[in-house]
Regions:
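Core FKBP-type peptidyl-prolyl cis-trans isomerase
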Residues: 4-46, 90
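Short histidine
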Residues: 29, 79-81, 124
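Acidic, gly/ser/pro-rich intrinsically disordered tails
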Residues: 1-2, 19-22, 42-44, 87, ...
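Beta-strand/loop nucleic-acid-binding surfaces
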Residues: 47-55
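Short coil/turn motifs at secondary-structure junctions
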Residues: 14-16, 34-38, 56, 80-82, ...
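Beta-rich strand-turn-strand
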Residues: 54-89, 102
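Residue-level recognition of specific faces of alpha-helices
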Residues: 4, 28-30, 50, 60, ...
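OB-fold and OB-like beta-barrel modules that bind single-stranded nucleic acids
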Residues: 9-13, 31, 67-78, 96-99
């Protein structure tokens, strides 16, 4: 049996480090992963995958990645259950074994600065075209 997950996506929120009562570091984040195909209206849809990152890896993720960071994740699927209000609930998440940042800090800063830019500013008039 083999349980391996490899994903590329963007963090949907700033990761926050939590320390458990046993002094272990952990962060739980969500990764937005585009589907390989477009919907009927021509738009890409995304799945939002829960990640759990432990220890030094969690500390590194919190230090170097932020909301919108493009990362590659290598891990495994885990299902856990918990009781709430007399009901058993199941949660499936990815336990992260490693990750890689796929954009530099400069690229991230440029993306964040351009996020609010109006597309009208990017349209060139016909006289401005070089050909």
């Amino acid at each position: 049996m083999y349980n391996k997950v490899i994903m590329i996506g963007r963090l949907t929120a700033q990761p926050e480090l939590v320390t458990t009562p046993t002094e272990k570091s952990v962060t739980r984040v969500t990764l937005a992963v585009n589907r390989r195909f477009k919907s009927q209206n021509g738009e890409r849809e995304a799945d939002f995958i829960s990640l759990v990152v432990w220890g030094r890896l969690a500390e590194t993720l919190v230090s170097y990645a932020g909301k919108g960071s493009l990362i590659s994740v290598d891990g495994e699927l885990r299902t856990r259950k918990y009781e709430k209000d007399g009901h058993t609930n199941y949660v499936t998440e990815v336990l992260c074994h490693s990750f890689q940042l796929l954009e530099s800090r400069a690229q991230r800063a440029m993306r964040e600065n351009n996020a609010g830019q109006d597309l009208a500013d990017l349209v060139l008039e016909e006289e401005e075209l070089p050909f």
